[in-house]
């Protein structure tokens, strides 16, 4: 027999599916969709506005660029009119910010995010919600993508630094919810040290509406010491910079139980005792589908893998449902943990927290290593506007090749808007460029530079190159919406010299 709790979960799922099906039917007609956004209840208009924004985003690169831009302008106009009428106006400004971003118009996007935060703060003060002195952390972003761990890590650091006012952080977890975090172990055993996770019954609509403005949008704008940072990644870069200036330790440290657990599994995976390893995570289309500007191929990392192995290191491949290693690939000291029986969220935390460094791509699993303060080298990276690692970490960006050109554009192009903003499938086509995958040789050279950094053997030329790139990113505003902010992490010196 079904328990009441099972029935509640089933009904909740059916309601969500029914609503999404209804939205899908409405959105099949553009005229009807725009009519619906201006009609009906305020709550329905807000919900459908967000859905239809994603519908339009899914068409970028698939329709003529001029037509797409006109559609964005039309939708933005409608959203702005609705924002004037709705006390929850920030809901519309977030959609407007996303839409302008998709066109590469960062100036208009930043203005929208600025309005988002101002209107939300005004509402909180007007309704006296600030007296509760709490911030709600929505659990769902941590279920949708592991990369949001990085946003939360930066936010928590800003709170600990006192740059953001210290408030009680609460994550309400609905009872009987079907929610499944991308890493259950990290949330319940580490994140819970900073955020109170409370089980709650289904909240009445009137209460949900009251506390919704207190919910922290992890990817949204932040106010730091009185200044609004409309672009979240710029604020997070500041978090890393300030954290290092105060010489603080990572927020998280692996506990003894997990350390013993991880060592036992390592032995069963075949790693020799006391051997060191590098975590390798390469985004492909096996888990969340294809995104050409972020996907990479395992064989491009062969030289880098051989380089690590030649030093006596091991390579542990991370991920979920990763593309199986082809039979003719004979990688030395290589463990395909991603496709092993031992893969689980607890072991993911152990591996990311104990690696000598994390070799990743434009996919969020590296943020686990970030929270534990491990060295990071990201390859085939985009967008550069989201670079918010530590000052000793490395990013090897994808270059862009403009339509009709035979060779890639210089490095400074990918550091400049709109190309530094490419973060949706289709933006390449819209902007008339192709993102170029890093060559195996460049990936291997970046790994060698990381080793020199870890061993304290960097040359003066390399150190000067890092400073030069930081000045370049400040000049080009690679991190948008800041106050003379530069990217604090490194681009490998050989790459800067080769492609400038």
Segments predicted by a language model, with ranges:
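N-terminal targeting/anchoring "stem" of glycan-biosynthesis enzymes
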Residues: 2-500
């Amino acid at each position: 027999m079904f328990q009441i709790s099972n029935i509640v979960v089933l009904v909740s799922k059916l309601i969500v599916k029914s609503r999404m099906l209804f939205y899908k039917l409405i959105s099949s007609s553009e005229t009807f969709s725009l009519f619906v956004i201006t009609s009906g209840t305020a709550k329905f208009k807000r919900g459908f506005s967000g859905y239809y924004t994603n519908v339009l985003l899914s068409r970028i690169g698939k329709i003529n660029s001029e037509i797409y831009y006109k559609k964005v302008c039309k939708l933005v106009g409608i959203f702005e009119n609705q924002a004037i009428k709705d006390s929850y106006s920030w809901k519309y400004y977030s959609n407007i910010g996303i839409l302008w971003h998709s066109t590469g118009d960062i100036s208009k996007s930043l203005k929208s995010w600025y309005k988002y935060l101002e209107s939300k703060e005004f509402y909180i003060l007007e309704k006296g919600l600030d007296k509760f002195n709490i911030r709600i952390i929505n659990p769902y972003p941590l279920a949708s993508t592991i990369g949001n761990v990085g946003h939360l890590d930066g936010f928590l650091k800003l709170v600990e630094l006192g740059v953001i006012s210290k408030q009680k952080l609460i994550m309400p977890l609905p009872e009987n919810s079907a929610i499944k975090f991308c890493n259950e172990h990290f949330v319940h055993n580490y994140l819970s040290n900073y955020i109170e996770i409370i089980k709650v019954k289904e909240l009445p609509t009137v209460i949900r509406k009251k506390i919704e403005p207190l919910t922290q949008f992890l990817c949204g704008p932040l106010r730091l010491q009185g200044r609004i940072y409309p672009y979240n990644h710029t604020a997070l870069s500041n978090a890393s910079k300030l954290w290092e200036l105060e010489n603080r330790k990572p927020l998280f440290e692996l506990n003894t139980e997990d350390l013993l657990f991880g060592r036992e599994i390592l032995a069963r995976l075949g790693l020799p005792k006391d051997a060191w390893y590098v975590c390798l995570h390469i985004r492909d289309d096996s888990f969340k589908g294809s995104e050409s500007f972020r996907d990479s191929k395992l064989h491009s990392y062969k030289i880098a893998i051989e380089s690590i192995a030649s030093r006596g290191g091991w390579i542990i491949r991370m991920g979920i449902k990763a593309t199986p290693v082809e039979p003719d690939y004979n990688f030395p000291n290589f463990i395909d943990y991603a496709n092993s029986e031992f893969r689980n969220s607890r072991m993911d935390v152990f591996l990311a927290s104990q690696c000598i460094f994390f070799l990743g791509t434009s996919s969020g699993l590296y943020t686990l290593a970030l929270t534990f303060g491990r060295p990071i080298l990201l390859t085939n990276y985009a967008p550069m506007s989201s670079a918010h690692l530590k000052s000793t970490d490395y990013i090897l960006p994808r270059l862009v090749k403009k339509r009709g050109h035979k060779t890639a554009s210089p490095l400074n192009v990918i550091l400049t808007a709109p190309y530094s903003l490419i973060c949706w499938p289709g933006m390449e086509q819209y902007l008339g460029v192709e993102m170029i995958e890093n060559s195996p040789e460049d990936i291997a050279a970046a790994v060698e530079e990381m080793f020199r950094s870890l061993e304290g053997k960097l040359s003066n030329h390399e150190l000067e190159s890092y400073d030069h790139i930081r000045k370049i990113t400040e000049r080009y505003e690679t991190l948008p919406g800041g106050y003379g902010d530069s990217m604090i992490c490194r681009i490998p010196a050989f790459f800067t010299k080769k492609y400038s």
